[in-house]
Amino acid sequence: MSIPREREDQKLLLRGLMNVRVPKKINPRFLQIQDEYLRAEMEEKNILFKEKNQLFYRRRMAKIQQLKEAIEEADAVVIGAGAGLSTSAGFVYTGERFSKYFGDFAGKYGFEDMYSGGFYPFDSLEEYWGYWSRYIYINRYMNAPKPVYENLLRLVQEKDYFVLTTNVDHCFQKAGFDKHRMFYTQGDYGLWQCSRPCHHETYDNRKIVEKMVEAQGYTVAADGTLLAPQRAALKMTVPSELVSHCPKCGAPMTMNLRADSTFVEDDGWHKAASRYDDFIRRHQGMKVLFLELGVGYNTPGIIKYPFWQMTAGNPKAVYACINYRDAACPTELQNQAICIEGDFERL
Protein backbone atom coordinates (compact mmCIF):
# COMPACT_ATOMS: atom_id res chain seq x y z
CA MET A 1 0.00 0.00 0.00
CA SER A 2 1.41 3.37 -0.98
CA ILE A 3 1.60 6.31 1.39
CA PRO A 4 -0.81 9.11 0.34
CA ARG A 5 0.92 12.39 -0.51
CA GLU A 6 -2.02 14.78 -0.61
CA ARG A 7 -2.83 16.46 2.70
CA GLU A 8 -6.55 15.61 2.66
CA ASP A 9 -5.76 11.98 1.84
CA GLN A 10 -3.39 11.92 4.81
CA LYS A 11 -6.13 13.22 7.08
CA LEU A 12 -8.58 10.55 5.93
CA LEU A 13 -6.03 7.80 6.34
CA LEU A 14 -4.98 8.91 9.81
CA ARG A 15 -8.54 9.33 11.03
CA GLY A 16 -9.29 5.85 9.77
CA LEU A 17 -6.30 4.42 11.57
CA MET A 18 -7.24 6.17 14.83
CA ASN A 19 -10.73 4.60 14.75
CA VAL A 20 -9.57 1.02 14.13
CA ARG A 21 -11.44 -1.43 16.39
CA VAL A 22 -9.44 -4.58 15.60
CA PRO A 23 -5.71 -4.43 16.34
CA LYS A 24 -3.68 -4.17 13.16
CA LYS A 25 -0.02 -3.93 12.41
CA ILE A 26 0.64 -0.29 11.56
CA ASN A 27 3.35 0.75 9.19
CA PRO A 28 5.83 2.98 11.14
CA ARG A 29 5.68 5.40 8.25
CA PHE A 30 2.02 6.04 9.04
CA LEU A 31 2.97 6.96 12.61
CA GLN A 32 5.55 9.36 11.25
CA ILE A 33 2.93 10.93 8.97
CA GLN A 34 0.56 11.23 11.93
CA ASP A 35 3.19 12.95 14.04
CA GLU A 36 4.12 15.35 11.23
CA TYR A 37 0.50 16.16 10.54
CA LEU A 38 -0.36 16.80 14.20
CA ARG A 39 2.71 18.99 14.65
CA ALA A 40 1.82 21.01 11.54
CA GLU A 41 -1.78 21.39 12.66
CA MET A 42 -0.75 22.55 16.14
CA GLU A 43 1.71 25.00 14.64
CA GLU A 44 -1.00 26.46 12.43
CA LYS A 45 -3.31 26.84 15.41
CA ASN A 46 -0.60 28.49 17.50
CA ILE A 47 0.22 30.94 14.72
CA LEU A 48 -3.47 31.76 14.29
CA PHE A 49 -3.89 32.18 18.06
CA LYS A 50 -0.88 34.50 18.26
CA GLU A 51 -2.13 36.56 15.32
CA LYS A 52 -5.55 36.92 16.92
CA ASN A 53 -3.98 37.89 20.24
CA GLN A 54 -1.75 40.47 18.58
CA LEU A 55 -4.69 41.92 16.68
CA PHE A 56 -6.77 42.04 19.88
CA TYR A 57 -3.90 43.72 21.75
CA ARG A 58 -3.38 46.34 19.03
CA ARG A 59 -7.08 47.17 18.92
CA ARG A 60 -7.24 47.32 22.70
CA MET A 61 -4.26 49.67 22.94
CA ALA A 62 -5.75 51.86 20.23
CA LYS A 63 -8.98 52.14 22.24
CA ILE A 64 -7.09 52.94 25.43
CA GLN A 65 -5.22 55.70 23.60
CA GLN A 66 -8.53 56.94 22.19
CA LEU A 67 -9.97 57.05 25.71
CA LYS A 68 -6.93 58.93 27.01
CA GLU A 69 -7.40 61.56 24.31
CA ALA A 70 -11.13 61.77 25.05
CA ILE A 71 -10.37 62.52 28.71
CA GLU A 72 -7.82 65.18 27.77
CA GLU A 73 -10.14 66.88 25.29
CA ALA A 74 -13.32 66.74 27.37
CA ASP A 75 -14.85 69.86 28.87
CA ALA A 76 -16.42 67.63 31.51
CA VAL A 77 -16.34 63.98 32.58
CA VAL A 78 -19.38 62.21 33.98
CA ILE A 79 -18.36 58.97 35.68
CA GLY A 80 -21.03 56.31 35.99
CA ALA A 81 -19.87 53.50 38.27
CA GLY A 82 -21.42 50.13 39.02
CA ALA A 83 -20.52 47.13 41.15
CA GLY A 84 -17.90 45.94 38.67
CA LEU A 85 -15.60 48.83 39.61
CA SER A 86 -15.54 47.82 43.28
CA THR A 87 -15.04 44.20 42.27
CA SER A 88 -11.99 45.35 40.31
CA ALA A 89 -10.79 47.08 43.50
CA GLY A 90 -11.02 43.78 45.39
CA PHE A 91 -14.39 44.15 47.10
CA VAL A 92 -15.64 40.67 46.21
CA TYR A 93 -18.52 39.08 48.10
CA THR A 94 -17.55 35.44 47.57
CA GLY A 95 -14.58 33.12 47.93
CA GLU A 96 -11.74 33.69 50.38
CA ARG A 97 -12.97 37.09 51.55
CA PHE A 98 -16.41 35.68 52.34
CA SER A 99 -14.96 32.65 54.13
CA LYS A 100 -12.60 34.82 56.17
CA TYR A 101 -15.32 36.98 57.70
CA PHE A 102 -18.44 34.82 57.44
CA GLY A 103 -17.22 31.23 57.66
CA ASP A 104 -19.21 30.65 60.86
CA PHE A 105 -22.44 31.97 59.33
CA ALA A 106 -21.84 29.95 56.15
CA GLY A 107 -21.29 26.80 58.21
CA LYS A 108 -24.48 27.33 60.20
CA TYR A 109 -26.84 28.48 57.45
CA GLY A 110 -25.30 27.24 54.20
CA PHE A 111 -25.25 30.44 52.14
CA GLU A 112 -22.16 30.92 49.97
CA ASP A 113 -21.80 34.67 49.54
CA MET A 114 -22.34 37.87 51.50
CA TYR A 115 -25.19 39.08 49.32
CA SER A 116 -27.31 35.97 49.89
CA GLY A 117 -26.65 36.11 53.62
CA GLY A 118 -28.00 39.64 53.73
CA PHE A 119 -31.48 38.31 52.92
CA TYR A 120 -31.46 35.51 55.48
CA PRO A 121 -34.36 35.67 58.00
CA PHE A 122 -32.34 35.53 61.21
CA ASP A 123 -34.26 34.59 64.34
CA SER A 124 -33.24 37.66 66.31
CA LEU A 125 -32.13 41.24 65.78
CA GLU A 126 -29.02 40.40 67.79
CA GLU A 127 -27.97 37.81 65.20
CA TYR A 128 -29.15 39.96 62.29
CA TRP A 129 -26.85 42.76 63.40
CA GLY A 130 -24.09 40.27 64.16
CA TYR A 131 -24.09 39.46 60.47
CA TRP A 132 -24.75 42.93 59.14
CA SER A 133 -22.23 44.72 61.36
CA ARG A 134 -19.44 42.60 59.84
CA TYR A 135 -20.90 43.15 56.37
CA ILE A 136 -20.99 46.92 56.87
CA TYR A 137 -17.57 47.20 58.43
CA ILE A 138 -15.54 45.28 55.84
CA ASN A 139 -17.34 46.80 52.84
CA ARG A 140 -17.69 50.38 54.09
CA TYR A 141 -15.05 51.17 56.67
CA MET A 142 -12.12 49.05 55.49
CA ASN A 143 -10.12 50.24 52.49
CA ALA A 144 -10.38 48.40 49.20
CA PRO A 145 -7.51 45.93 48.63
CA LYS A 146 -6.49 47.53 45.32
CA PRO A 147 -6.04 51.27 44.49
CA VAL A 148 -8.50 51.29 41.60
CA TYR A 149 -10.43 54.33 42.81
CA GLU A 150 -7.25 56.25 43.59
CA ASN A 151 -5.98 55.56 40.06
CA LEU A 152 -9.27 56.73 38.61
CA LEU A 153 -9.04 59.98 40.58
CA ARG A 154 -5.61 60.67 39.11
CA LEU A 155 -7.14 60.41 35.63
CA VAL A 156 -9.86 62.99 36.22
CA GLN A 157 -8.77 65.19 39.13
CA GLU A 158 -7.80 68.07 36.82
CA LYS A 159 -11.10 67.83 34.93
CA ASP A 160 -14.55 69.15 35.69
CA TYR A 161 -16.07 65.84 36.80
CA PHE A 162 -19.13 64.40 38.49
CA VAL A 163 -19.74 60.88 39.79
CA LEU A 164 -23.04 59.02 39.48
CA THR A 165 -22.94 55.62 41.16
CA THR A 166 -25.15 52.75 42.26
CA ASN A 167 -22.39 51.55 44.61
CA VAL A 168 -23.00 51.90 48.33
CA ASP A 169 -19.49 51.25 49.66
CA HIS A 170 -18.23 54.86 49.84
CA CYS A 171 -15.08 53.99 47.85
CA PHE A 172 -15.10 57.25 45.89
CA GLN A 173 -14.96 59.43 48.99
CA LYS A 174 -12.36 57.24 50.68
CA ALA A 175 -10.17 57.63 47.59
CA GLY A 176 -10.36 61.42 47.77
CA PHE A 177 -13.14 62.33 45.32
CA ASP A 178 -14.96 65.55 46.18
CA LYS A 179 -18.14 64.55 48.07
CA HIS A 180 -19.99 67.51 46.55
CA ARG A 181 -19.44 66.05 43.08
CA MET A 182 -21.02 62.67 43.79
CA PHE A 183 -24.51 61.20 43.74
CA TYR A 184 -24.97 57.82 45.45
CA THR A 185 -28.40 56.88 44.12
CA GLN A 186 -28.93 53.61 46.00
CA GLY A 187 -27.89 54.48 49.54
CA ASP A 188 -24.85 53.95 51.72
CA TYR A 189 -23.69 51.08 53.93
CA GLY A 190 -22.68 53.74 56.45
CA LEU A 191 -26.24 55.01 57.01
CA TRP A 192 -29.24 53.64 58.89
CA GLN A 193 -32.88 54.67 58.69
CA CYS A 194 -36.14 53.89 60.44
CA SER A 195 -37.49 50.57 59.15
CA ARG A 196 -41.07 51.85 58.84
CA PRO A 197 -39.94 54.66 57.99
CA CYS A 198 -41.69 57.21 60.17
CA HIS A 199 -39.46 60.07 59.00
CA HIS A 200 -36.98 60.84 56.23
CA GLU A 201 -33.66 61.16 58.02
CA THR A 202 -30.62 58.90 58.00
CA TYR A 203 -28.04 58.25 60.71
CA ASP A 204 -24.31 57.56 60.61
CA ASN A 205 -23.61 54.08 61.98
CA ARG A 206 -19.82 53.86 62.30
CA LYS A 207 -19.48 54.06 66.09
CA ILE A 208 -22.24 51.52 66.72
CA VAL A 209 -20.95 49.16 64.03
CA GLU A 210 -17.45 49.23 65.52
CA LYS A 211 -18.91 48.36 68.93
CA MET A 212 -20.90 45.52 67.35
CA VAL A 213 -17.91 43.87 65.68
CA GLU A 214 -15.79 44.30 68.80
CA ALA A 215 -18.54 42.68 70.87
CA GLN A 216 -18.26 39.61 68.62
CA GLY A 217 -14.56 39.31 69.38
CA TYR A 218 -12.95 41.30 66.59
CA THR A 219 -10.28 43.94 67.08
CA VAL A 220 -10.08 47.05 64.90
CA ALA A 221 -6.41 47.56 63.95
CA ALA A 222 -4.76 50.96 63.62
CA ASP A 223 -5.14 50.83 59.83
CA GLY A 224 -8.84 50.00 60.14
CA THR A 225 -8.46 46.30 59.36
CA LEU A 226 -10.75 43.89 61.19
CA LEU A 227 -8.74 41.27 63.12
CA ALA A 228 -10.26 38.01 64.38
CA PRO A 229 -9.24 36.59 67.78
CA GLN A 230 -6.36 34.10 67.68
CA ARG A 231 -7.84 31.50 70.02
CA ALA A 232 -11.36 32.33 71.15
CA ALA A 233 -14.31 31.64 68.86
CA LEU A 234 -16.21 34.56 67.40
CA LYS A 235 -19.68 35.34 68.64
CA MET A 236 -22.41 35.54 66.01
CA THR A 237 -24.66 37.92 67.92
CA VAL A 238 -24.38 41.40 69.41
CA PRO A 239 -25.59 42.50 72.86
CA SER A 240 -29.22 43.60 72.93
CA GLU A 241 -28.25 47.07 74.13
CA LEU A 242 -26.40 47.66 70.84
CA VAL A 243 -29.47 46.96 68.69
CA SER A 244 -30.53 50.38 67.39
CA HIS A 245 -34.09 51.66 67.30
CA CYS A 246 -35.65 54.70 65.70
CA PRO A 247 -35.27 57.75 67.99
CA LYS A 248 -38.76 58.95 67.00
CA CYS A 249 -41.05 55.88 66.89
CA GLY A 250 -38.97 53.09 68.46
CA ALA A 251 -39.08 50.76 65.45
CA PRO A 252 -35.88 48.83 64.65
CA MET A 253 -33.39 50.67 62.49
CA THR A 254 -32.44 49.19 59.13
CA MET A 255 -30.00 49.75 56.28
CA ASN A 256 -30.37 52.80 54.07
CA LEU A 257 -30.23 50.71 50.90
CA ARG A 258 -32.73 50.89 48.06
CA ALA A 259 -34.62 47.60 48.16
CA ASP A 260 -38.24 48.75 48.05
CA SER A 261 -40.48 51.77 48.57
CA THR A 262 -39.32 52.19 52.19
CA PHE A 263 -35.92 53.52 51.08
CA VAL A 264 -35.36 56.95 52.60
CA GLU A 265 -34.19 59.66 50.22
CA ASP A 266 -32.98 62.14 52.81
CA ASP A 267 -32.02 65.79 52.44
CA GLY A 268 -28.46 64.87 51.44
CA TRP A 269 -29.77 62.53 48.74
CA HIS A 270 -31.96 65.25 47.21
CA LYS A 271 -29.19 67.85 47.30
CA ALA A 272 -26.83 65.45 45.52
CA ALA A 273 -29.50 64.72 42.90
CA SER A 274 -29.93 68.45 42.31
CA ARG A 275 -26.19 68.99 41.95
CA TYR A 276 -26.01 66.18 39.39
CA ASP A 277 -28.94 67.56 37.39
CA ASP A 278 -27.35 71.02 37.47
CA PHE A 279 -24.00 69.62 36.27
CA ILE A 280 -25.66 67.91 33.31
CA ARG A 281 -27.65 71.04 32.46
CA ARG A 282 -24.58 73.32 32.57
CA HIS A 283 -22.64 71.10 30.16
CA GLN A 284 -25.30 70.52 27.53
CA GLY A 285 -23.87 70.78 24.03
CA MET A 286 -20.27 70.70 25.30
CA LYS A 287 -17.55 68.06 24.93
CA VAL A 288 -18.72 65.67 27.60
CA LEU A 289 -17.20 62.25 28.23
CA PHE A 290 -19.71 59.82 29.72
CA LEU A 291 -17.38 57.28 31.32
CA GLU A 292 -19.22 54.12 32.34
CA LEU A 293 -17.28 51.72 34.57
CA GLY A 294 -18.40 48.27 35.69
CA VAL A 295 -22.10 48.83 35.05
CA GLY A 296 -24.24 45.78 34.34
CA TYR A 297 -27.91 45.28 33.53
CA ASN A 298 -29.41 45.03 37.03
CA THR A 299 -30.38 48.72 37.02
CA PRO A 300 -29.52 50.00 33.50
CA GLY A 301 -32.04 52.82 33.80
CA ILE A 302 -29.86 54.70 36.28
CA ILE A 303 -26.55 54.99 34.40
CA LYS A 304 -26.31 53.02 31.16
CA TYR A 305 -29.47 54.04 29.33
CA PRO A 306 -29.30 57.74 30.33
CA PHE A 307 -25.65 57.86 29.22
CA TRP A 308 -26.66 56.43 25.84
CA GLN A 309 -29.48 58.94 25.49
CA MET A 310 -27.37 61.95 26.46
CA THR A 311 -24.59 60.89 24.09
CA ALA A 312 -27.06 60.45 21.25
CA GLY A 313 -28.44 63.92 21.91
CA ASN A 314 -25.04 65.63 21.85
CA PRO A 315 -22.81 65.20 18.76
CA LYS A 316 -19.82 66.48 20.76
CA ALA A 317 -20.23 63.85 23.49
CA VAL A 318 -18.31 60.59 23.81
CA TYR A 319 -19.59 57.45 25.50
CA ALA A 320 -16.87 55.21 26.95
CA CYS A 321 -17.61 51.85 28.52
CA ILE A 322 -15.15 49.64 30.40
CA ASN A 323 -16.53 46.34 31.59
CA TYR A 324 -15.13 42.90 32.25
CA ARG A 325 -17.78 41.60 29.86
CA ASP A 326 -20.49 43.16 27.71
CA ALA A 327 -18.71 46.40 26.88
CA ALA A 328 -21.05 47.47 24.11
CA CYS A 329 -23.28 50.24 22.86
CA PRO A 330 -26.13 50.72 20.38
CA THR A 331 -25.17 50.72 16.70
CA GLU A 332 -26.27 54.35 16.45
CA LEU A 333 -23.53 55.39 18.90
CA GLN A 334 -20.60 53.51 17.40
CA ASN A 335 -19.02 56.65 15.97
CA GLN A 336 -19.16 58.31 19.40
CA ALA A 337 -18.25 55.30 21.53
CA ILE A 338 -15.17 53.64 23.00
CA CYS A 339 -15.97 50.18 24.36
CA ILE A 340 -13.23 48.22 26.13
CA GLU A 341 -13.66 44.77 27.65
CA GLY A 342 -11.38 44.04 30.57
CA ASP A 343 -10.58 44.68 34.21
CA PHE A 344 -10.18 48.41 34.88
CA GLU A 345 -7.40 47.64 37.37
CA ARG A 346 -5.26 46.14 34.58
CA LEU A 347 -5.77 48.79 31.92
Language-model features: where?
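Conserved catalytic alpha/beta core of Sir2/sirtuin-type deacylases, generalized to analogous enzyme cores
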Residues: 2-347
